[in-house]
Swiss-Prot record:
NCBIfam families: portal_PBSX (TIGR01540). This is Uncharacterized protein YqbA. The gene is yqbA. It comes from Bacillus subtilis (strain 168). It holds the Pfam family Phage_portal. InterPro entries: PBSX_Firmicutes, Phage/GTA_portal, Phage_portal_PBSX. Belongs to the phage portal family. PBSX subfamily.
Length: 510
């Protein structure tokens, strides 16, 4: 008895041409030794991966915008309006304020300091590392900065400790001590050419071509300094999202699968079964060509013609070949397909994971459909308090520690501005009972009025404006703002200022 057999042939589209599996080449691959240290991850790959992610760039932009996007600001390191401060100290502080303003303004002649620092923060959030080059002037003071692309920079090992001077304040007196510190070198490679840099604050002379410390190095070959901004305490920083890198690649592959799905059209997979016959070679060839030509909308409605050859059962009574009737059955496998938007939930979960690595609510990545004003304000305030304010303090703390001593600035410090969530109208409502109770002086309200007017208002020097409202006269007034409506024995300039103040406070009272 002959055995029946079933033959199966799988017909699918021809695969695309194979390509290299290497993602990014490391130009320093042949240069790593005991001096130049390799990073734990490919920096070029980390920097470019944001171009293939649907969420990473938004998170990086949110950090960049909210950390440096509001600009630089300055503040005195002491209460300049204190009665204990002499006029000489106040004048010196004002001079340092102007000096620091000019320093920040001219850090770069083509771009603002905020723009360059934004590039550094973007690199830091993508790769865990960011670099700026510091240029000194003829007085050996920092005068300018340049952005350094992180993918071209590598870190060298620590040098032996050397003795350096350190200046600090103790009980208002400037003091100087000597301490030992170890410095690093940095190397940049572009088009195969290597240039060395030294860590900011290293007093030694470094040859930018050889990477050797040599006091006899010509001026044009002396290396500049580098400031390294990194995440973490390692030799190299690591991006805060590095634990989710597999999710990033998975989400990318899911997007590519969706793209190919829509590019090739919804061509339903099917099983073609032939009973009592076999598919002719011509039909098999045409079926293979049909599968190879599926791609594109123009091929979405082609007809498929199959020819099958029946199997001879033997000869009939007339001596002719008797062919068994052929049955061709095409069974759809569409029920095993997922919905049109494949991996939609997977992609959403990945977005949530990446966003959580940055500790950002959806509001900061352009997903505000689930927010109202109350929830949006709460999300902004919590994120500002827990994420952006600490980041600004870390960056300005580093800049102040590095630059201010070299600039001989000690009474003013640099800070990064943030969003102002305070509503002057709401503050005015809160202040009304304090004003009525005589607990607020006119000078206490100058900052509030300045924010409303959009300008800086200095405090009035007269002592009467430092006394609470309602206490300047023996009898209390029914209107808590009435004390500001009059100017007794005031100069014309003072009268004008008081009138402006009156108008502002009247608006706030309404």
């Amino acid at each position: 008895m002959s055995k029946k057999s079933v033959k199966a042939r799988v017909i699918k589209a021809s695969p695309p041409t194979e390509s290299t599996k290497q993602i990014y080449e490391d130009e320093f691959a042949d240069s790593y030794d005991s001096n130049i240290l390799p990073p734990p991850y490919n920096l070029k790959e980390l920097k470019m991966i944001a171009e293939y992610s649907t969420i990473l760039q938004q998170c990086v932009d949110a950090y960049r915008t909210n950390i440096v996007g509001f600009g630089f600001d300055f503040e005195y390191s002491f209460d300049v309006n204190s009665p204990d401060v002499t006029n000489e100290e106040k004048t010196e502080a004002e001079s340092e304020w102007t000096k620091l303003e000019e320093f920040v303004k001219y850090l770069h002649f083509d771009e603002s300091a905020e723009t360059l620092l934004g590039f550094v923060i973007e690199d830091r959030e993508k790769t865990g590392n960011g670099f700026i080059e510091v240029i000194r002037n003829g007085e050996n003071k920092p005068a300018g900065i340049e952005y350094m692309d992180v993918q071209n920079v590598r870190v060298c090992k620590l040098s032996e400790p050397i003795e350096v001077d350190f200046t600090y304040f103790e009980q208002g007196q400037m003091k100087s001590i000597k301490r030992e510190k170890r410095f690093r070198k940095y190397v940049q490679m572009i088009d195969g050419r290597m240039v060395y840099f030294k860590e900011y604050g290293d007093p030694r002379t470094l040859n930018l071509e050889t990477g050797q410390y040599d006091e006899q190095t010509p001026l044009e070959k002396r290396a500049n300094e580098v400031v390294h901004f990194k995440i973490g305490s390692g030799i190299y920083g690591k991006p805060r999202w590095i634990g989710h890198i597999v999710n990033l690649y998975g989400a990318r592959k899911a997007e590519e699968l969706n793209f190919m799905y829509f590019k090739q059209g919804r061509h339903i997979p099917a099983a073609i079964t032939i009973e009592n016959g076999m598919l002719s070679e011509d039909s098999y060839t045409q079926l293979q060509d049909y599968m190879n030509g599926l791609e594109g909308v123009e091929n979405a409605h082609k007809f498929l013609l199959l020819e099958a050859e029946g199997i001879a059962k033997g000869k009939n009574i007339h001596g002719d070949e008797e062919i068994a009737p052929v049955k061709v059955d095409i069974k759809s496998l569409a029920e095993i397909l997922q919905e049109d938007a494949l991996f939609l939930e997977y992609d959403q979960k990945n977005r949530d994971k990446i966003r959580s690595a940055f500790r950002l609510p959806p509001l900061y990545t352009g997903e505000a459909q689930d927010y109202n004003r109350a929830t949006a304000d709460t999300a902004r305030k919590i994120t500002e308090e827990q994420v952006f304010q600490p980041e600004r303090k870390l960056i300005t703390g580093k800049l102040n520690a590095l630059f201010l001593n070299d600039l001989e600035i000690h009474k003013v410090r640099l800070q990064l501005k943030g969003p102002d969530f305070r509503d002057p109208l709401e503050i005015a409502k809160v202040l009304t009972p304090f004003i009525t109770a005589g607990a607020v002086s006119p000078n206490d309200l100058r900052d509030l009025a300045g924010r409303v007017l959009g300008k800086t208002l200095e405090e009035w020097p007269e002592e009467e404006y430092n006394r609470p409202l309602g206490k300047t006269n023996e009898s209390s007034v029914s209107d808590p703002l009435a004390a500001l409506f009059k100017s007794k024995n005031g100069t014309p300039n003072m009268i004008g200022l008081l009138k402006d103040m009156r108008d502002v406070l009247e608006d706030l009272k309404r």
